[in-house]
Amino acid sequence: MLDAQTIATVKATIPLLVETGPKLTAHFYDRMFTHNPELKEIFNMSNQRNGDQREALFNAIAAYASNIENLPALLPAVEKIAQKHTSFQIKPEQYNIVGTHLLATLDEMFNPGQEVLDAWGKAYGVLANVFIHREAEIYHENASKDGGWEGTRPFRIVAKTPRSALITSFEFEPVDGGTVAEYRPGQYLGVWLKPEGFAHQEIRQYSLTRKPDGKGYRIAVKREDGGQVSNWLHHHASVGDVVHLAAPAGDFFMNVAADTPVSLISAGVGQTPMLAMLDTLAKEQHTAQVNWFHAAENGDVHAFADEVSELGRTLPRFTAHTWYREPTEADRAQRVFDSEGLMDLSQLEAAISDPAMQFYLCGPVGFMQFAAKQLVSLGVNNENIHYECFGPHKVL
């Protein structure tokens, strides 16, 4: 526990943190990667270049300082970060490295004096121990499961299937021929790659896209402009290649009773965690209402449409609606979509009126903000809205 003086000293630095903003974390990362370049093998350097990780870390530091007297308020954020850390296989000793560079950054940017540095050192130590403890629990849980493992495990690509102009699915089975751990629908896999030509090992998280079967895993990857890993997977990865996977993880997952109505709302590749949820609901013969609401640019980039239709036909109460923002002439001729333009949930108000309904959202942050705002305006409680950000977390 932190003493009152330490808490007061840390809270007194909040105005300085806010004034400095992500410049603080930019300095921190530049310093850390200069002194510990081996960490480039763990961190997503694309998120470093676009500034997303710097913003996410700054928000986390500011939130910790603001809630230092009420640590339970931070537990949801801790769980989200701890789950992601296990996908990167973060170890306790790496927290010491981060702590060293955080304190050095505060000193170099602000020269706040030893009392402030000591207070932040104590505060960081408490937070680091919370993460270390929770991550140890997750590692143990993953290793103890039937088909579970520690660290990473080699898997072979057994199928590679184009699903749209931008999205390709990959199926993996373990090289050792053993079973694989189950997961909750909505969770992701950590994919570890360092093909020839990569400057650093790259680790990415991709949502699992079907109900667990104990034999293997399936993900779907969108080819991003300039995306090193996604382009390698699309253009170079082949059936028979071996990749290393960290065990399934993530705090975003569906957990509902058979009589709970569910809405799965997505845009673009954000449908991937929803596919695992829909597959689970279908195979478990979910009895309550299930809605599938999806937005895509057009039919060329709309993946898994046939699979969704097939799964929907097995559910007793299923409603699907698809919006194309800019449908092609072929889309219009074939009528493969329901509405043109942006997603408008007021069109389906009757289908989402049950106050017990749980809503799961995934897609670009702007889309999720747009969809969540509509849901709230239609009377949905915020507590019933669950969402996943691909990349560093953002608050809707």
Swiss-Prot record:
The record marks K84, E388 as: Influences the redox potential of the prosthetic heme and FAD groups. FAD binds at Y188, R204, Q205, Y206, S207, C389, F390, G391, P392. It catalyses: 2 nitric oxide + NADPH + 2 O2 = 2 nitrate + NADP(+) + H(+); 2 nitric oxide + NADH + 2 O2 = 2 nitrate + NAD(+) + H(+). Its cofactor is heme b; FAD. Heme b binds at H85. Its EC number is 1.14.12.17. The active site is at Y95 (charge relay system), E135 (charge relay system). NADP(+) binds at G268, V269, G270, Q271, T272, P273. Keywords: Detoxification, FAD, Flavoprotein, Heme, Iron, Metal-binding, NAD, NADP, Oxidoreductase, Oxygen transport, Transport. It is an enzyme of class 1 (oxidoreductase). Residues 147-396 are annotated as: Reductase. Gene3D superfamilies: Globins (1.10.490.10), Nucleotide-binding domain of ferredoxin-NADP reductase (FNR) module (3.40.50.80), Translation factors (2.40.30.10). The record marks Y29 as: Involved in heme-bound ligand stabilization and O-O bond activation. Residues 150-255 form the FAD-binding FR-type domain. Binds 1 heme b (iron(II)-protoporphyrin IX) group per subunit. Binds 1 FAD per subunit. It comes from the Bacteria. One of its GO terms (biological process) is cellular response to nitrosative stress. Residues 1-136 form the Globin domain. GO terms for molecular function: FAD binding; heme binding; metal ion binding; nitric oxide dioxygenase NAD(P)H activity; oxygen binding; oxygen carrier activity. Consists of two distinct domains; an N-terminal heme-containing oxygen-binding domain and a C-terminal reductase domain with binding sites for FAD and NAD(P)H. PANTHER family: FLAVOHEMOPROTEIN. Belongs to the globin family. Two-domain flavohemoproteins subfamily. In the C-terminal section; belongs to the flavoprotein pyridine nucleotide cytochrome reductase family. Is involved in NO detoxification in an aerobic process, termed nitric oxide dioxygenase (NOD) reaction that utilizes O(2) and NAD(P)H to convert NO to nitrate, which protects the bacterium from various noxious nitrogen compounds. Therefore, plays a central role in the inducible response to nitrosative stress. This is Flavohemoprotein. The gene is hmp.
